Amino acid sequence: MGGILALKKDDCHAAPTHLLAEDGSYNTTFLQKYLPQTKIDLICVAGRQQGVVSRTGLALAELPGRAFVNRQRGSGTRMLLDFELKKAGIDPGSIPGYEREVTTHIAVALAVKSGEAEAGLCVYSAAKALNLPFVPVSQERYEIAIRHEHAGDPRVRALISAIRSARFREILENLGGYDTTETGTLREVR
């Protein structure tokens, strides 16, 4: 959410976003709400696998009663977790540690690896980096939102070029948990 707010204030030319709306769509709802008069270009970075990381292969339905580590309120991962818990009929209050927040995917995986938590929600690549079991929950759409008036800026053009490169796709595929089918595609939001 911070990236979209920075775009709104024109503090940046581009911001990463993976915000899930209540209708199951990604990013456009929030851009239309917070930047209704601004033309935005969205460039797809990748589809990104989010799931439950644990030491024992826990699934989402097994989280009640388990020590959990969460992402911060307002993050795309937290929004995804809340969406999936609601869909599954799981009360967040039944998950000890739901209010314990960290700010990165690797911090979630490290808390699990160290035994501080039994589970958390993170991207596959963070679980893979620490050799932890991962049970997929959802694939999210990870994009870069660009104020259209800045699309011609050489720095923005360099960013788009890098995202569209074969080397970038190769890096994502080697990390694991990324679907590069739509990497580099552009869509407009008004």
Located regions from the model:
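Ligand-binding cleft/hinge of the Venus flytrap
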Residues: 10-11, 77-100
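Short helices/loops that flank or line small-molecule/ion binding pockets
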Residues: 2-13, 19-20, 101-116, 125
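Short loop->beta-strand "edge-of-pocket" segments that line small-molecule binding or catalytic clefts
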Residues: 60-84
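Periplasmic-binding protein-like
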Residues: 39-51, 132-161, 163-188
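Flexible hinge/capping segments at coil-to-helix
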Residues: 45-69
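A ligand-binding cleft/hinge motif common to bilobed small-molecule-binding domains
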Residues: 18-33, 109-138
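Short beta-strand-centered segments that line the small-molecule binding cleft or hinge
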Residues: 3-48
